[in-house]
UniProtKB/Swiss-Prot annotation:
GO biological process, one term: L-arginine biosynthetic process
Protein name according to UniProt: Argininosuccinate synthase
Keywords noted in UniProt: Amino-acid biosynthesis, Arginine biosynthesis, ATP-binding, Cytoplasm, Ligase, Nucleotide-binding
Localisation: Cytoplasm
Keyword Glycoprotein set for record: no
Assembly and binders: Homotetramer.
PROSITE patterns according to UniProt: ARGININOSUCCIN_SYN_1, ARGININOSUCCIN_SYN_2
Main location: cytoplasm
EC number: 6.3.4.5
Family: Belongs to the argininosuccinate synthase family. Type 1 subfamily.
HAMAP family, sorted: Arg_succ_synth_type1
UniProt pathway: Amino-acid biosynthesis; L-arginine biosynthesis; L-arginine from L-ornithine and carbamoyl phosphate: step 2/3
UniProt binding sites for L-aspartate: T126, N130, D131
Length: 404
């Protein structure tokens, strides 16, 4: 007598934060699809609850398995560092705080799906934000056969319904004291949106900030020296640091001076404009220092072209194309351009600003004897006349024609 084979139950890997929406999503997905849910929480320095507490909550909410990953160093080394080397500021202002964390999380979601034989990955994004694209474009780039679902978008899991579901199932998660804001944070920065900020005339209030102190409050300035090797921050005030430690220390020191506050209306990937408030003290301090060291060490034509590459790199990352061939190719160029970005940058952190006050580098292209206007100037000014004649020749020829 042959035994009947037990049908294989489909499995869904869920990007789990430990909050109400993703806790409810565990049971919601199970009811809507009949699948078993595996919860995966990834620590990218967002702070908050202990990872083991989050893991146990996922199991209590119905996950058949729950995994947590401490990815802080990975996030800093493999995602934040390339952004620093690229001086990445979307629309010249936003240091890609959320956009950088999504591919980190995606990598762990895909690994969990492959480990547990899941066919689908789920996330908690809405249908009008950038993150749904970042998650799903990243997932299919790493595992083209995986399907993606978003309960809020695909199954109309509104917050009211989520609260009712939570109370009905008696899930171990609070349903009160909901912030009026949508907040996303990691070690590279913090993003705040919605609530009264949706009226773009309303000024942000101090209560929304956590990573930065009020820059208007009087306090003594803080001087810091950041050392780089090939574009990588390797020391602060002469003490060796990892990339993660550099970000964390500058978050604390620059944040205490109110550095890194950004209030902007940005162009979202989905076609709308959105008002966002960011705090990124460590990111802004590092990018400011790195840019200045590049000014000292990178040849002019390379520096000019790199600025174009930086903008495109930032757009690709913002648009969820972290794993794209173009982004990888541009990163190769950026790494090459950073080969001689070595040295120290001295900065004063005060009043919401990170101001560079000193630069030194063994690979500097700054030649004092060529730059000085004092005695000892080695610049051959006699060569300037002939250079100008040749440089302006094409304009001179065109002017003769156009003004005739």
């Amino acid at each position: 007598m042959q035994c009947e084979e037990k049908p294989v139950t489909e499995r869904v890997v869920l990007a789990y934060s430990g909050g109400l929406d993703t806790s409810v999503a565990i049971g919601w997905i199970a009811e809507e699809t009949g699948a078993e849910v595996i919860a995966v929480a990834v620590d990218v320095g967002q702070g908050g609850e202990d990872l083991d507490v989050i893991r146990k909550r996922a199991l209590a909410c119905g996950a058949v398995e729950a995994e947590v990953a401490d990815a802080k160093d990975e996030f800093a080394d493999e995602y934040c560092l390339p952004a620093v080397k690229a001086n990445a500021l979307y629309m010249d202002r936003y240091p890609l705080v959320s956009a950088l964390s999504r591919p980190t999380i995606v990598k762990h979601l895909v690994a969990a799906a492959q480990k547990h034989g899941a066919t689908t990955v789920a996330h908690g994004c809405t249908g009008k934000g950038n993150d749904q694209v970042r998650f799903e474009a990243g997932i299919v780039a790493l595992a083209p056969g995986l399907k993606c679902i978003a309960p809020v978008r695909d199954y109309a899991m509104t917050r009211d319904k989520a609260i009712a579901f939570c109370e009905e199932k008696r899930l171990p998660i609070a349903t009160t004291k909901k912030s009026p804001y949508s907040i996303d944070q990691n070690v590279f920065g913090r993003a705040v949106e919605t609530g009264f900020l949706e009226d773009i005339w309303n000024a942000p209030i101090e209560d929304i900030y956590e990573y930065t102190s009020n820059p208007a409050e009087p306090r003594e300035a803080d001087e810091v020296v950041i050392s780089f090797k090939e574009g990588v921050p390797v020391a602060i005030d002469g003490r060796p640091v990892t990339v993660l430690q550099a970000i964390q220390q500058l978050n604390e020191r620059a944040g205490a001076q109110g550095v890194g506050r950004i209030d902007m209306v940005e162009d979202r990937l989905v076609g709308i404009k959105s008002r966002e408030v960011y705090e990124a003290p460590g990111a802004i301090a590092l990018i400011t220092a790195h840019q200045e060291l590049e000014n000292v060490t990178v040849e002019r034509e390379l520096a000019r072209y790199k600025r174009q590459v930086e903008q495109r790199w930032g757009e690709l990352v913002y648009d969820g194309q972290w794993f794209s061939p173009l982004k990888r190719a541009l990163e190769g160029f950026i790494d090459e351009a950073n080969q001689h970005v070595n040295g120290d940058i001295r900065m004063t952190l005060h009043g919401g600003r990170a101001v560079v006050t000193g630069r030194r580098s063994e690979t500097s292209l700054y030649d004092f004897n060529l730059a000085t206007y004092d005695t000892g100037d080695s610049f051959d000014q006699a060569a300037a006349k002939g250079f100008i004649d040749i440089y302006s020749l094409s304009s001179k020829i065109a002017a003769k024609r156009d003004l005739a």
